[in-house]
Amino acid sequence: MPTPDFILRLRKHVGHELLWLTGVTAVVVAESGEILLHRRADDGFWSTPGGILEPGEQPAAALVREVAEETGVDVAPERIASVVTEPPFTYGNGDRVQFMDVTFRCRPVGGSARPDEEESLEVGWFAPDRLPPMNERVMRRIAHAREEGPAYYAAP
């Protein structure tokens, strides 16, 4: 996945030090109940679409942009499903990051599911009982988005 320019500029000053970033995740649910997933080009795993906010960008706008870029599907955010701080992560090149992730439940409003081949190798709609293998973090986001009620957050 391409690294945003603002992060490349920051890395020139901070090297591999931990960066605190805001990310957004979309759990896109069709009328049929199927969930939109993409197989990531960077690690080959299935995941929900999403990405990093650009400086000054609103979370919902970043979400709409990222889903369209990665999957070709236009979405309308319906509600925030969860707000969580993920554990720190170190990339293969040594860069360290930690994300506050805002997960939105969305509905599709246009476009056509297709991989962009830069960030997504495959894109598809999956019944909730037929999801491909995914990590626990992604499964948790999907579960929160499918629940009714207030957004999930880690209680103090």
Predicted regions: what is each one?
Residues 21-23, 32, 120:
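A structure-centric signal for secondary-structure junctions around beta-strands
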Residues 28-31, 106-108:
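Active-site beta-strand termini and strand-to-loop segments that position acidic
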Residues 30-70:
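Conserved Nudix-box catalytic region and its N-terminal flanking loop in Nudix hydrolases
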Residues 1-25:
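Acidic, metal-coordinating catalytic segment for phosphate/diphosphate chemistry
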Residues 21, 30, 41-43, 48, ...:
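Short connector loops at helix/strand junctions that flank enzyme active sites
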